[in-house]
UniProtKB/Swiss-Prot annotation:
Active-site feature positions: 239 (proton acceptor)
Gene Ontology MF: a single term: D-xylulokinase activity
E.C. number: 2.7.1.17
Assigned keywords, A-Z: ATP-binding, Carbohydrate metabolism, Kinase, Nucleotide-binding, Transferase, Xylose metabolism
Gene that specifies this protein: xylB
Designated name of the protein: Xylulose kinase
Lineage: Bacteria, Bacillati, Bacillota, Bacilli, Lactobacillales
C-alpha cells in the first residue's frame, strides 16, 4: 500500500488528508490556529502558526497510522490565496503574514487602478481588490519601509510549508495568479507591473506547474516522523483551484456551485477567456488550463444572519421546515444577499441587502424561502455570465457545501439554474485536490483524468429541473435582477448616513 498526503492550509485551521494509491480515505487530522487583528480591518497570522499546526498533523498521523512512515510516498498542498508572506535573506519571516481577508489596502488598490488602468485587467484578468497580494506589498512599502528593506523573498502561505519541508522556494501558477503580479496568458511574472511598482523580480519565487516537484522532505524532518522513503513534495494549488480539481472540474461540461459562508461558482477554462473583469480568472492546477470564478460574498452568511436575527432559538431544520409549502418566487417576496456588499457581478462594497415586495400575507416561511432563492439567484448571476461568454451551457453542475446536504435546496438549485445537479459521495474540499496532485506526481496515475476517476465519486441520484418551476423562476429572476440597479444609490446613501453617525 502507498499513501499520499494532502495538506490544506486554511484561514483558521490546517487539515491533513491521507489517502491510499487507489483513492481510499485512510484518515484526516487537523489543527487550529488564531487570526490576529491588531487593528480594525487588519487580519494577520504568524507563519510559525502554520508550522506548529503541520507538525501537529504529522505527529497525529504517525501515531494513528502504524505504517505511515513506511508507506508515505508524496505530499502536496492547497492553501488560502493572496496572503502575503515576506522573508529575509535567511528565509525567516520579517512581518506577520497579511491575510486575504485583510482590508487595510483600499488606498493601494486605487493606486494600482490609477497607474495601470485597463492594462491590469489585460495582463492579470482581474481587477484590484483588497484581498489580492500586490496591494499588500504596496502597503508594506509605504507603511513599513524598514521592514520592506529586509525583504528578500515574497511567498504565499502553502509555499512556506513546502519551504519548511524541502528547503526550496517555488510557487505555482494557480496561486501566483492571485497576486496581481502574474501575466496569466504568458505564465510569467509581469515585467510591466513589477517595474511600475519598483518590485525586484528576484524576490519573487520561481514559477512551476502545480504537479511539479518542489523537492524531497528534508532528512531531519523525515527522521522525526520516521519516514523511511524519500518522500516527494509537489507544488499543489490555491484553495479554489485545488477544490475544483477535487470535485472533478477538469472539463467544460460541468460547473461547480459551492455554498459556504460565501458562495462560489467555478468553471473549467481550456483557454484564456475575456470576462472583462466581471469574474475572477486564474490558472488551474491542471497544467495549461484556467478556471473562472464568480463570488457571492454572503451566501451561507446571509442564511446565518437571517437565522440569528429572525429565527433565534430555532435549528436550521426548524427554520426551513415549511419553506417547501411555499411556491417558487415566495409569492412575490424577494431577498438580495448583499448584507456585506457584493462581489460578482457588481463589485460594490456599499450595496446592502433588502427584502422587496413584503405583503401582509407573508409569513416566516415566505421570508425563509426568499432568502434561499435570493442566494441562489446571486449565484446564477455568475453562472449566466460564464455560459453567455462561452456560448456554451453546462451539462451538469456539481453542488458542494451546506446546500448540497438538503434535497429540497438541491431541487431549488436545479430549477433556478435549469441544470441537472449532482453531489459528491464524500466532500473533502481542497485537501482532496492536493492528494490527487501528489498521486499524479508520484506516478501512481498517468493523467489527472485517471486520478479523478479513482478519487472523485458522485452520488447516483441527481436532481433534474422541473419545467414548471423553471418557467416561474425565469420570470421572477428577471424581476430580481432589477433590484440592484434600483436600490444601489439608496444603499450607498444609507452607508454614508451610517458612517457619518
Amino acid at each position: 500500500m502507498t499513501y499520499v498526503l494532502g495538506i490544506d492550509l486554511g484561514t483558521s485551521s490546517l487539515k491533513g488528508i491521507l489517502m491510499d494509491e487507489v483513492g481510499n480515505l485512510i484518515t484526516t487530522k487537523s489543527a487550529e490556529y488564531q487570526i490576529d487583528t491588531p487593528k480594525q480591518g487588519y487580519s494577520e497570522q504568524r507563519p510559525e502558526y502554520w508550522i506548529v499546526a503541520l507538525e501537529s498533523v504529522l505527529t497525529g498521523l504517525s501515531v494513528e497510522i502504524s505504517d505511515f512512515g513506511q508507506q508515505l510516498a508524496g505530499i502536496s498542498f492547497s492553501g488560502q490565496m493572496h496572503s502575503l508572506v515576506v522573508l529575509d535573506d535567511n528565509n525567516k519571516p520579517v512581518y506577520p503574514a497579511i491575510l486575504w481577508n485583510d482590508v487595510r489596502t483600499s488606498k493601494q488598490c486605487q493606486e494600482i487602478t490609477d497607474r495601470l488602468g485597463q492594462r491590469l485587467l489585460e495582463i492579470t484578468k482581474n481587477i484590484a481588490l483588497e484581498g489580492f497580494t500586490l496591494p499588500k506589498i504596496l502597503w508594506l512599502q509605504e507603511n513599513e519601509p524598514e521592514v520592506w528593506s529586509r525583504v528578500k523573498k515574497i511567498m504565499l502561505p502553502k509555499d512556506y510549508l513546502s519551504l519548511w519541508l524541502t528547503g526550496n522556494i517555488y510557487t505555482e501558477f494557480s496561486d501566483a495568479a492571485g497576486t496581481l503580479l502574474l501575466d496569466i496568458e504568458k505564465k510569467q511574472w509581469s515585467e510591466e507591473i513589477t517595474d511600475a511598482f519598483n518590485i525586484d523580480r528576484r524576490i519573487l519565487p520561481e514559477l512551476i506547474e502545480s504537479t511539479d516537484r518542489t523537492g524531497f522532505v528534508k532528512a531531519e524532518i523525515a527522521e522525526r516522523y520516521k519516514l523511511t522513503n524519500e518522500v516527494k513534495v509537489f507544488a499543489g494549488g490555491a484553495d479554489n483551484a485545488a477544490a475544483a480539481l477535487g470535485v472533478g472540474l477538469i472539463n467544460e461540461e460541468v460547473g461547480l456551485i459551492s455554498m459556504g459562508t460565501s458562495g462560489v461558482v467555478s468553471a473549467y477554462e481550456p483557454k484564456i477567456a475575456d470576462y472583462k473583469g466581471k469574474l475572477h480568472f486564474f490558472n488551474h492546477t491542471v497544467p495549461g488550463a484556467c478556471y473562472s470564478m464568480g463570488v457571492t460574498l454572503a451566501a451561507g452568511n446571509s442564511l446565518n444572519w437571517y437565522k440569528e436575527t429572525f429565527g433565534k432559538g430555532l435549528s436550521f431544520n426548524e427554520l426551513l421546515s415549511e419553506v417547501y409549502t411555499v411556491s417558487p418566487g415566495s409569492e412575490g417576496l424577494l431577498f438580495t444577499p448583499y448584507i456585506v456588499g457584493e462581489r460578482t457581478p457588481h463589485f460594490d462594497s456599499k450595496i446592502r441587502g433588502s427584502f422587496i415586495g413584503i405583503s401582509a400575507h407573508h409569513e416566516q416561511k415566505h421570508f425563509s424561502r426568499a432568502v434561499l432563492e435570493g442566494i441562489t439567484f446571486s449565484l446564477r448571476d455568475s453562472k449566466d455570465i460564464m455560459e453567455k461568454t462561452k456560448n456554451k451551457k453546462f451539462k451538469r453542475l456539481i453542488s458542494v457545501g451546506g446546500g448540497a446536504q438538503n434535497p429540497d435546496i438541491m431541487q431549488m438549485q436545479a430549477d433556478i439554474f435549469n441544470s441537472e445537479m449532482i453531489r459528491l459521495t464524500v466532500e473533502q474540499g481542497p485537501g482532496l485536490g492536493a492528494c490527487m496532485i501528489a498521486a499524479f506526481g508520484c506516478g501512481l496515475f498517468d493523467s489527472l483524468e485517471a486520478v479523478t476517476k479513482a478519487f472523485v465519486h458522485y452520488k447516483e441520484a441527481s436532481f433534474i429541473p422541473n419545467p414548471k418551476n423553471v418557467a416561474r423562476y425565469e420570470q421572477i429572476y428577471q424581476i430580481w435582477k432589477q433590484v440592484y440597479k434600483n436600490t444601489s444609490e439608496i444603499s450607498h446613501q444609507l452607508v454614508e448616513f451610517n458612517d457619518e453617525g
